[in-house]
Amino acid sequence: MIKKIPMIIGGVVQNTSGYGMRELTLNNNKVNIPIITQSDVEAIQSLNIENKLTINQIVNFLYTVGQKWKSETYSRRLTYIRDLIKFLGYSQEMAKLEANWISMILCSKSALYDIVENDLSSRHIIDEWIPQGECYVKALPKGKSVHLLAGNVPLSGVTSILRAILTKNECIIKTSSADPFTATALVNSFIDVDAEHPITRSISVMYWSHSEDLAIPKQIMSCADVVIAWGGDDAIKWATEHAPSHADILKFGPKKSISIVDNPTDIKAAAIGVAHDICFYDQQACFSTQDIYYIGDSIDIFFDELAQQLNKYKDILPKGERNFDEKAAFSLTERECLFAKYKVQKGESQSWLLTQSPAGSFGNQPLSRSAYIHQVNDISEVIPFVHKAVTQTVAIAPWESSFKYRDILAEHGAERIIEAGMNNIFRVGGAHDGMRPLQRLVNYISHERPSTYTTKDVSVKIEQTRYLEEDKFLVFVP
């Protein structure tokens, strides 16, 4: 039986029994997704849900949803895990971890408050006018936010949606053909908790293809007040071409990440961290380590220890299924590296691949837990491989070394500096791809104080007409 993915408009699962269907093949299994009609577009464009919720009400709703995801018997969670395994090729452990993280994000009330506090300067600014300088300021939602999701990291879609919810924006979510499940499961869980809740009613989920008739997608894009685009170069280019001229575009495009191991005294701890950063999401994420730069003389010991830790991850977080082409690319990379006389070691059943090669001698990168290790003398030999708009995360072991290198790494384009083993946890207060996303999802409105309000520099009321009449402007210049 072919699985059918629902279309959701305004928090309501649509009856698409008479619709045309688009068939996707995922992990050798068929999925049907309804094709959007003109009436669907009109329903999306006319949707206008009044959202007078406070930040407390928003966070409490998300927490309630998160408690459902926390339950291992929640039917929506169980179905989601099965879908990730069957259609996306996730291992049981990977799929369960993804569901666990959804629960963690939704249930972390303090973190949700702090995200707003850190990005917008105050968690109250979306609810009320806040005194700032000589004004009162309030942050209002942009309006309709269109989310063009990627399929490589399901949690990126969850994050995108939650940012829009926290800033009271409506969400029009275009799922990826590689993962039509995550956003749909999340919004269905909103419906399970409260189908009439303003957050539920302000969200729509659907799919369209960039390579087919664009008449319908263009109409949807035309109503966007802000576009959040995730994915590769083609996806970002498509978003840029089709977003309205007035709409802001948040671009989360393709990035690469590296690890620096700085002559650690605890080689095992460093290897554990690097192994995690290689294995999480099987290197499909922008934050996944692909290259390791080892500063010091104990690279052989580190190489062997890293191999052991990769074997451990083979057991505690098995990699997902791969198709024939992916396996062939893995084998080809191994043979090319052996032919180049590099030191090569691989795990059982292609569970991982480790290659020691000179810095700059990059071969193919099949991902799927394959990494290159390069021995260098100091940080100056790493910097040529750190690039603006390309290098996202630099993971460092030991953590203390990050203080030595953070300035030069930042100057050359690194966007995020972390402790090895923490690549998938974006700390509250940090930037994402060089920006604070929530600031781009709101409009700041200023209510400025009157002429009678004195400033720090001018202790009398501002009487501009009098200053002109008496030609006394310069008297008040500090």
UniProtKB/Swiss-Prot annotation:
UniProt cross-references to CDD domains, sorted A to Z: ALDH_Acyl-CoA-Red_LuxC
Any one GO molecular function term: acyl-CoA dehydrogenase activity
If you read the UniProt record, what top EC class would you report for this enzyme, in one word?
Answer: oxidoreductase
In terms of domain of life, where is this protein from? Answer: Bacteria
Pfam families of this UniProt entry? LuxC
What EC number(s) is this enzyme filed under? 1.2.1.50
Assigned keywords, A-Z = Luminescence, NADP, Oxidoreductase
Q: In which pathway does it act?
A: Lipid metabolism; fatty acid reduction for biolumincescence
The catalytic activity, as recorded, is: a long-chain fatty aldehyde + NADP(+) + CoA = a long-chain fatty acyl-CoA + NADPH + H(+)
Transmembrane residues, as ranges? none
Output the GO biological process annotations, alphabetical, semicolon-separated.
bioluminescence
Q: Per the similarity annotation, which family is this?
A: Belongs to the LuxC family.
What function does the entry list? LuxC is the fatty acid reductase enzyme responsible for synthesis of the aldehyde substrate for the luminescent reaction catalyzed by luciferase.
What protein name is recorded for this chain?
A: Long-chain acyl-protein thioester reductase 2
Native source organism of the sequence:
Photobacterium leiognathi
